[in-house]
C-alpha cells in the first residue's frame, strides 16, 4: 500500500484543530502531529494510504475554511515520500501516535 503525507497550514490554531478533526474523521489516516511555525501559522500532518490522505486533506480544507478568523495558507500531499524524509522532517510515526495507526 503506497503511503502518503498530507499537510495543511493555517493561520490560527482553531482552524488547524478543526482541520485535524475533520481529517481523521473523513478517512483512515493517522494524525502524525502538528508544528507551530510562528506568527500564528500552524501545520497539521497526517499519513496513510494515498487515496485516504487525499480525501482527508480535502475534508480538512473544507472544515478549516469555515472557522471564523481562521485562514488556510497552504496544503500539500506527498505520495510515497522518500524514507529519508522521516529522519529530517516531523512526519515519522512516534510512540505517541503508534496506537492510532490504521
Curated annotation (Swiss-Prot):
UniProt key word Zinc-finger: no
Protein name: Carboxysome shell protein CcmK2
Assembly description: Homohexamer. Interacts with CcmO in the carboxysome. Interacts with CcmN.
Record remark on domains: The tight homohexamer forms a pore with an opening of about 5 Angstroms in diameter and is positively charged.
Localization per record: Carboxysome
Name of a matching Pfam family: BMC
Function: One of the shell proteins of the carboxysome, a polyhedral inclusion where RuBisCO (ribulose bisphosphate carboxylase, rbcL-rbcS) is sequestered. Assembles into hexamers which make sheets that form the facets of the polyhedral carboxysome. The hexamer central pore probably regulates metabolite flux.
CDD domains in the cross-refs: BMC_CcmK
One Gene Ontology cellular component annotation held by this UniProt entry: carboxysome
GO function term, MF aspect, one: structural constituent of carboxysome shell
Record keywords: Bacterial microcompartment, Carbon dioxide fixation, Carboxysome, Photosynthesis
Biotechnology remark: Heterologous expression of 12 carboxysomal genes in E.coli (ccaA, ccmK2, ccmK3, ccmK4, ccmL, ccmM, ccmN, ccmO, ccmP, rbcL, rbcS, rbcX) leads to the formation of bodies that resemble carboxysomes, have densely packed paracrystalline arrays and RuBisCO activity. These structures open the door to generating carboxysomes in plant cells to increase their photosynthesis and productivity, as well as tailoring bacterial microcompartments to specific metabolic needs and molecule delivery.
Top-level division of the source organism's lineage: Bacteria
Family per record: Belongs to the bacterial microcompartments protein family. CcmK subfamily.
Recorded coiled-coil stretches: none
PANTHER family with a match to the protein in the record: CARBOXYSOME SHELL PROTEIN CCMK4 (PTHR33941:SF13), PROPANEDIOL UTILIZATION PROTEIN PDUA (PTHR33941)
One GO term (biological process): photosynthesis
Entry keyword Magnesium: no
Species for this entry: Synechococcus elongatus (strain ATCC 33912 / PCC 7942 / FACHB-805)
Disruption phenotype: Cells do not grow in normal air but do grow on 2% CO(2), called a high-CO(2) requiring phenotype, HCR. Cells make aberrantly large polar bodies instead of wild-type carboxysomes, no accumulation of CcmO. An alternatively generated deletion mutant does not form abnormal polar bodies.
Start and end residues of each BMC domain: 4-90
Amino acid at each position: 500500500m503506497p503511503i502518503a503525507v498530507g499537510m495543511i497550514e493555517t493561520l490560527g490554531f482553531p482552524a488547524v484543530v478543526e482541520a485535524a478533526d475533520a481529517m481523521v474523521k473523513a478517512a483512515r489516516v493517522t494524525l502524525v502531529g502538528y508544528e507551530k511555525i510562528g506568527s500564528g501559522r500552524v501545520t497539521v500532518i497526517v499519513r496513510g494510504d494515498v487515496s485516504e490522505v487525499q480525501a482527508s486533506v480535502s475534508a480538512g480544507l473544507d472544515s478549516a475554511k469555515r472557522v471564523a478568523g481562521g485562514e488556510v495558507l497552504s496544503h500539500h500531499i506527498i505520495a510515497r515520500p522518500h524514507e529519508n524524509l522521516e529522519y529530517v522532517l516531523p512526519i515519522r510515526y512516534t510512540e505517541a501516535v503508534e496506537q492510532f495507526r490504521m
